[in-house]
Each structure stands twice: as C-alpha cells, then as structure tokens.
C-alpha cells in the first residue's frame, strides 16, 4: 500500500492528471507510445520520440546527439553473462543517464542491464503534464515482463520514484523478482509538516528556489 501511495503522491506533486499495442490515445495525449514486444523496438521508438519532441539545450549537432543518447533507454550486455538481468528505473525529471556508471559496473560483472525512460521525461517539462502514474507503471510492467523471459534471474533497481515503481511491480507480480537495488527510495515522507505541502503550493511554487544547473540539464 505504501508503494502505491508514494507513486500517487509523486503524481499529485507534479500536477499530473489524469494495454496493449501503441494506441491513438497515447498520441493524442502526447505521451511516448508504449506496447512494444521487445526492448530493441522500445528503445528505437523512444529514440524517434525524443528526437522529434525534445527541446534541445545544446546548439551543436554533436551536442544534440549527446543529449539524445543521454536520455535513451539503453542495454548494457555483458561479455560473459551469468544469467542475471536487472531493469533500472530513474526518478522524476531525470533520465536513464543517471545509471550510466552503475550499469557499466554491473555489466562488467556478468549482469544484463537495461534502463527505461519514464513517459513524460526526456523531452521537455510540459510533457510531464499528460503523463500519469499508470503510464510509468506500464513501461515498468512491459519491460520487466520482457526481461524476465530472457534471463534466469531478474533483479529490479530504481532511484527515488523509480524505487516505488519497481516495488509496485514486484508487489503486483510476486515471485518474479530475485531482489532489488534501490537508491534513495521514496517510500515514506518523514518531515512533520509534509502534510502542508498541498496547501502551501497554492501560494508559492518553492520554499527554496531550486538552482538551475545548466551544465547538466542536457542529460535529463
């Protein structure tokens, strides 16, 4: 229950409103189409979607190529597989690039690593508006199901909201997941005045204005 509550809370904080093959409804909502039957097709469709819809930060061809690659779902295939695989899910407003270091390390140890891109991320902030928690659940469900059929032992990993999503999947699909690799899991809000966030948001967007780090904004 706390996992689903965490995902719902993330959706509300971002003002996100609100299964099979890629649908016309997805296109009408301006959400990255899902429903692919392989990781390769999913990654190819994501590349086409990001290329057509991203507001690029860098203004050179090389820079845009670097931006595109940073936001793509990726597969890190080990030279010598030991039969294990892991699906890594990033947090809100982030990208698969956040796992680039750990993914290479895991692959070097014989693990097949795949990352996903949450719908609404990777293009421009406005694209978070039509995306829903169900869209995020769906991409995890689809790609975890695909991975589980291709490896002997499936692990799931996440950062922040990504942790909620993989735990939610495991709760809904008992027995499929061997274990978890979780970074900063967002499963409980402990500050005593967190309940007031929805009220305060009527008067100001931020308690502390966030720092805009242009040096890394290209990778998310």
Label each residue range with its predicted role.
Residues 117-122, 186:
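Short beta-to-alpha linker loops that shape the active-site pocket of alpha/beta-hydrolase fold enzymes
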Residues 158-162, 166:
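Gly/Ala-rich beta-loop-alpha elbow adjacent to hydrolase catalytic centers
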Residues 69-118:
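Short, surface-exposed "cap/lid" segments of acyl-processing enzymes
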Residues 124-150, 155:
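Catalytic nucleophile-loop/oxyanion-hole region of alpha/beta-hydrolase
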Residues 24, 28-67, 185-220:
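The alpha/beta-hydrolase serine catalytic core
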Residues 168-172:
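Active-site signature of alpha/beta-hydrolase-fold catalytic machinery across serine-
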């Amino acid at each position: 229950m706390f996992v689903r509550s965490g995902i719902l809370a993330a959706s509300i904080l971002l003002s996100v409103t609100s299964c099979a093959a890629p649908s016309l409804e997805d296109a009408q909502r301006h959400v990255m189409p899902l429903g692919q039957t392989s990781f390769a097709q999913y990654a190819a469709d994501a590349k086409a979607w990001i290329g057509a819809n991203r507001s690029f930060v860098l203004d050179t061809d090389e820079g845009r190529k670097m931006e595109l690659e940073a936001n793509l779902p990726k597969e890190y295939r080990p030279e010598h597989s030991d039969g294990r695989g892991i699906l890594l899910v990033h947090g809100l407003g982030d990208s698969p690039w956040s796992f680039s270091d750990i993914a290479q390390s895991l692959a070097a140890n014989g693990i097949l690593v795949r990352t996903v891109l949450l719908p609404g991320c990777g293009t421009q902030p406005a694209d978070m508006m039509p995306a829903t928690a169900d869209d995020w659940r769906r991409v995890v469900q689809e790609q975890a199901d695909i991975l589980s059929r291709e490896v002997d032992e499936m692990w799931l990993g996440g950062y922040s909201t990504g942790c909620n999503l993989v735990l939610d999947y495991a709760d809904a699909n008992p027995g499929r997941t061997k274990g978890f690799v979780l970074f900063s899991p967002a499963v409980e809000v402990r500050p005593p005045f967190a309940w007031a966030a929805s009220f305060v948001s009527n008067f100001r967007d931020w308690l502390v204005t966030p720092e805009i780090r242009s040096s890394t904004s290209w990778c998310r």
